[in-house]
Amino acid sequence: METVLSFSAIAVAIIVGLCAVGTAIGFAVLGGKFLEGAARQPEMAPMLQVKMFIIAGLLDAVPMIGIVIALLFTFANPFVGQLAG
């Protein structure tokens, strides 16, 4: 049982780490492309900003699902119940 808990802790750490790295890379690319587009066409900056915020919200949604799965493995691990019963 300790093996399942230790592997679950490692899996949670990997999930949280990859969520953080993936979100950081996504925001870096998104911000860079926004600044590039705004520098090329300054009159389009307000429209690009609205689209950037919409995409930023969608970009945050995927890691939040990963964090929910990590919390599930942390506090309500389904694999421990299989070992006990």
Curated annotation (Swiss-Prot):
Site (Reversibly protonated during proton transport): 60
Transmembrane segments: 10-30, 53-73
Pfam families listed in its UniProt record: ATP-synt_C
Single GO term (MF): lipid binding
Gene Ontology cellular component list: plasma membrane; proton-transporting ATP synthase complex; proton-transporting two-sector ATPase complex, proton-transporting domain
Location within or outside the cell: Cell inner membrane
Major place of residence: membrane
Coiled-coil ranges per UniProt: none
InterPro entries: ATP_synth_csu_bac/chlpt, ATP_synth_F0_csu, ATP_synth_F0_csu_DDCD_BS, ATP_synth_F0_csu_sf, ATPase_proteolipid_c-like_dom, F/V-ATP_Csub_sf
Gene3D superfamilies: F1F0 ATP synthase subunit C
Record's bilayer topology term: Multi-pass membrane protein
Keywords associated with the record: ATP synthesis, Cell inner membrane, Cell membrane, CF(0), Hydrogen ion transport, Ion transport, Lipid-binding, Membrane, Transmembrane, Transmembrane helix, Transport
Gene Ontology terms describing biological process: proton motive force-driven ATP synthesis
CDD domains membership: ATP-synt_Fo_c_ATPE
Family: Belongs to the ATPase C chain family.
Purpose of the protein: F(1)F(0) ATP synthase produces ATP from ADP in the presence of a proton or sodium gradient. F-type ATPases consist of two structural domains, F(1) containing the extramembraneous catalytic core and F(0) containing the membrane proton channel, linked together by a central stalk and a peripheral stalk. During catalysis, ATP synthesis in the catalytic domain of F(1) is coupled via a rotary mechanism of the central stalk subunits to proton translocation.
Assembly description: F-type ATPases have 2 components, F(1) - the catalytic core - and F(0) - the membrane proton channel. F(1) has five subunits: alpha(3), beta(3), gamma(1), delta(1), epsilon(1). F(0) has three main subunits: a(1), b(2) and c(10-14). The alpha and beta chains form an alternating ring which encloses part of the gamma chain. F(1) is attached to F(0) by a central stalk formed by the gamma and epsilon chains, while a peripheral stalk is formed by the delta and b chains.
Family annotation (NCBIfam families): ATP_synt_c (TIGR01260), PRK06876.1 (NF005363)
HAMAP family membership: ATP_synth_c_bact (MF_01396)
Protein name: ATP synthase subunit c
Organism name: Vibrio cholerae serotype O1 (strain ATCC 39315 / El Tor Inaba N16961)
Gene giving rise to this polypeptide: atpE
